[in-house]
């Protein structure tokens, strides 16, 4: 670690060697109390207007009142005057080494270096341009806060602090060990979160060495190192209100600078089926919606496989009138039912991906038009049958009821359809048992992934909110349940 030198020229030479070729590097030589100095910062990250206003105000306010014998003559004396005897809003911790200096500058701060002083004075004059606080597009709700996380870490931390206004909320910041040196924060309530879990998360993130850190999801492979895991015991939210609710349950929230997505851990399987609106409606209607979500999730996984299994291997279980229509439709198509279903599933994923990656103003229209044209043309040309298109459409609609489970649901749907098409009822049963085994084998920091779905009072069926409030709940109470 390179310590700052008492020579201003050496410090500037070290900075110029690193950032001299960068157009945004700003270094301005000044003189304070007849002492040579320099202001260093990155342009457009720190506000030059605010900085010069602070320095000029300090110089004009304090210089006339100083007696000649108290006038500073060395860099150390000037530093002491500005730090301890002026009204400058400087940061408490001085800069003593080059790595810390660069970290402060890349955070949008300005640093004053003085000749003859081995410390730098830091000013928080950030002038970063960023996206304002907006409503997140991926988490719709009817009631409650409309605010969403922004891209700046400090803004997101302030949103959480505004919601949890107690001394129990702890927000630890650190810098990732990667080339980008991205700042992240670990947030938890010290009276509810498990100290062991917090220590484990802190240690894991310190030891993690990603190539770059652009989102909180980059930490998941280090927190839960499983190579072939479909379900991860984590969740994501872009709503400060949702993150605050999870913190009050004893969970840990990880925020990364530059990303509005907060990583919540540990997370349970049943939490993919609830939302903030569940607690703003009656318990009966909330329970109905949750049952509907569970049904939609399993429908999105098993419906194509069950349809292929019944139509190909067990046609006697289908009502005769429906069976005759399916047989007539399949007779007019050149592909077998199994291949037809796989083709439609893959086509729908291609259309969805195309709509997602296109500009927002065109994405929805392109997806809708492409689905209608391809479906109508395929049926008209006799390439695909109407029952297959109908089953695939129901499946595609069902998967969006639980967007947080979209990725595993898509892969499992393909796997179940393959198993049902190749091995019939045996393959379908084996696939269902495989899904169940995958879910039961997951443990979220000692808490079973499937816990709380039935007997917790806030699982598939929810009790009324008053009854839930009478017994404070944290996720660590489910350990080993």
Feature locations, PLM:
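Flexible domain-boundary/linker segments
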Residues: 32, 57, 118, 177, ...
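Transmembrane alpha-helical segments that form the functional core of multipass membrane systems
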Residues: 254, 267-415
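Hydrophobic alpha-helical transmembrane segments of membrane transport and translocation systems
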Residues: 386-388, 393-481
């Amino acid at each position: 670690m390179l310590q700052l030198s008492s020579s201003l020229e050496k410090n500037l030479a070290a900075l110029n060697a690193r950032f001299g070729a960068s157009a945004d590097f700003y270094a301005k030589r000044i003189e304070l109390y007849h002492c040579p100095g320099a202001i260093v910062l990155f342009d457009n990250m720190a506000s030059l207007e605010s900085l010069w206003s602070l320095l000029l105000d300090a110089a004009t306010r304090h210089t006339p009142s100083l007696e000649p014998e108290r006038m500073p003559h060395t860099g150390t004396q000037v530093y002491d005057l500005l730090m301890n005897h002026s009204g400058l809003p400087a940061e408490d911790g001085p800069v003593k080494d080059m790595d810390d200096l660069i970290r402060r500058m890349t955070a949008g701060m300005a640093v004053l270096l003085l000749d003859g002083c081995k410390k730098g004075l830091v000013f928080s004059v950030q002038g970063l341009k960023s996206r304002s606080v907006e409503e997140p597009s991926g988490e719709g709700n009817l009631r409650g806060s409309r605010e969403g996380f922004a891209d700046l870490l400090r803004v997101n931390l302030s949103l959480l602090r505004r919601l949890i206004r107690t001394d129990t909320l702890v927000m630890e910041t650190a810098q990732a060990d990667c080339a980008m040196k991205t700042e992240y924060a670990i947030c938890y309530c010290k009276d509810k979160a498990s100290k062991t879990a917090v220590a484990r998360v802190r240690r894991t993130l310190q030891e993690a060495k990603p190539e770059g850190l652009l989102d909180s999801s980059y930490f998941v492979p280090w927190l839960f190192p499983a190579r072939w895991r479909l379900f991860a015991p984590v969740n994501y939210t872009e709503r400060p209100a949702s993150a605050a609710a999870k913190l009050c349950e004893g969970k840990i929230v990880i925020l990364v600078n530059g990303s509005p997505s907060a990583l919540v851990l540990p997370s349970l399987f049943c939490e993919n089926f609830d939302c903030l609106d569940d607690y703003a409606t009656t318990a009966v209607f909330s329970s109905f919606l949750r049952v509907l979500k569970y049904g939609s999730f399993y429908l999105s996984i098993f419906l194509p496989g069950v349809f292929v299994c019944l139509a190909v291997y067990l046609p006697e279980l289908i009502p005769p009138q429906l069976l005759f229509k399916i047989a007539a439709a399949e007779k007019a198509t050149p592909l077998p039912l199994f291949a037809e279903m796989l083709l439609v599933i893959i086509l729908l994923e291609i259309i969805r991906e195309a709509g997602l990656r296109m500009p927002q103003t065109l994405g929805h229209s392109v997806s809708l038009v492409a689905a209608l044209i391809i479906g109508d043309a395929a049926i008209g040309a006799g390439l695909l049958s109407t029952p297959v298109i109908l089953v695939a459409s129901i499946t595609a609609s069902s998967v969006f009821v639980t967007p947080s489970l979209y990725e595993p649901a898509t892969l499992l749907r393909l796997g179940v359809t393959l198993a049902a098409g190749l091995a019939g009822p045996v393959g379908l049963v084996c696939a269902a048992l495989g899904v169940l085994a995958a879910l039961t084998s997951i443990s979220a920091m000692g808490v079973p992934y499937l816990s709380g779905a039935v007997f917790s009072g806030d699982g598939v069926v929810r009790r009324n909110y008053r009854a839930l409030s009478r017994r404070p709940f944290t996720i660590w109470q489910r350990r080993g349940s």
